Amino acid sequence: MSACPCNIVILPVEILKNSSKDTKYSLYTTINRGYDVPRLKYGIIVSPRVHSLETLFSDLGFDKNIEKSSLYLLLNDPTLAYPNFHEHFEQLKGETNKDLSLPTYYIPKVQFLTEAFDSEHTLATIGYKPNNKESYEITGFTSMGNGYGIKLFNYSVIHMMRSHKCKRVVADIIMEHDLLGYYEKKLGFVEVQRFKVLKEQHQVKVFDDKVDFTKDFHVIKMIKELGNHRL
């Protein structure tokens, strides 16, 4: 079967932390652009996902364990997404299963990046930060088009299972953003808890950053066991 036309860049946060302002700013704006879609559509959350370039890593929760956190990007054409791409990134050998070929994975072959990622060629983003033993939490999950988020989630999870021995992933979602069905039916998560956040709790620390919001909303905690993960 023909190879999957997917290109996934794996960015260890330890390398990203040392990278240039241009590199970090491009990811900061891309992630905020993805979160702006539900933020503006539903009008509940006022503050951007990442408040500033200086709070990029703390707002996404990477600062708690930078060494074991990663950010994945789904790119349509790596050579258009990052200048002189192959001088800065090298390919990981893809593994093929019976159903389809896996995408091409790339990792940095340098200790810091200097250029900006072109947001027009970045189709989705997802970050993973340690939650507890053999468990990681999703952060910075965006999709710039139909199906891109699902594709990146599935392929990034495969890499997390094989390279980080990840056995489960957890996620906190906002119920009023109509994400429950997406996480349950498309990604295979199950709900384990939900709680209400009251408007009177101004700037409550809901996720990893302080959130400004216009009315009460619910946070749903979800989990996915990866033992039976299938594409």
Swiss-Prot record:
Alphabetic keyword roster: Meiosis, Peroxisome, Sporulation
Chief site of localization: other
Subcellular localization, as worded in the UniProt entry: Peroxisome
A biological process from GO: meiotic cell cycle
Record's GO cellular component terms: peroxisome
SS bond list: none
Keyword Translocase found: no
Source superkingdom: Eukaryota
Role according to the record: Required for sporulation. Required for meiotic nuclear division.
Designated name of the protein: Sporulation protein RMD6
Gene name as annotated: RMD6
